Amino acid sequence: LSLRFIEVMRTNDNSAFFERHHTPGAAVAAKLEAMGWLPMLRPSGAGPAIDYAQPNAPGRIGIIAPYGKDFCATCNRLRVSAKGKFHLCLFGEHGIDLRPLLQADSQLDALVARIAKLTGTKPFAHHLHDGISGGTPHLASIGG
């Protein structure tokens, strides 16, 4: 059994909700550790989640804390929206249109080359700590 806690993230349409309901991932981690849950070592490249385990528990609890230390440094996620926009970060200003390259199998090599080139431009960090959530109106719009 695996359970994931995803820290609520500010987006363009949820400022009031965020202010009322945001619980830092660090607070959840502190409570888990106080109850005997221990952070597990994860292999490099495993993504930004921090998993906790307890010897007497049947599963794990993971925390995805975008406001936490080193979150962006460990992020290995990219998204393509239903509209064909490629998002290097959930909180970027805009997506990059890949739709023309998604229309035909004959475009596969060009698509792979474009994604490889763009991946090298992934930003090092979001600006959530500054109250800037980018151009995403809400995470559902890009599959988040």
Locations of the language-model features?
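Short secondary-structure boundary segments
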Residues: 7, 65, 90
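Flexible mid-to-C-terminal extensions adjoining Fe-S/redox cofactors in radical SAM and related proteins
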Residues: 73-144
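Active-site oxyanion/phosphate-handling segment shared across diverse enzymes
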Residues: 55-85
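Mixed-charge, polar/low-complexity N-terminal
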Residues: 52-53, 59-62, 66-68, 129, ...
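Glycine-rich, flexible loop/turn motifs
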Residues: 14, 19, 48, 68-71, ...
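Radical SAM enzyme [4Fe-4S]-AdoMet core and its adjacent flexible, acidic
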Residues: 1-62, 109
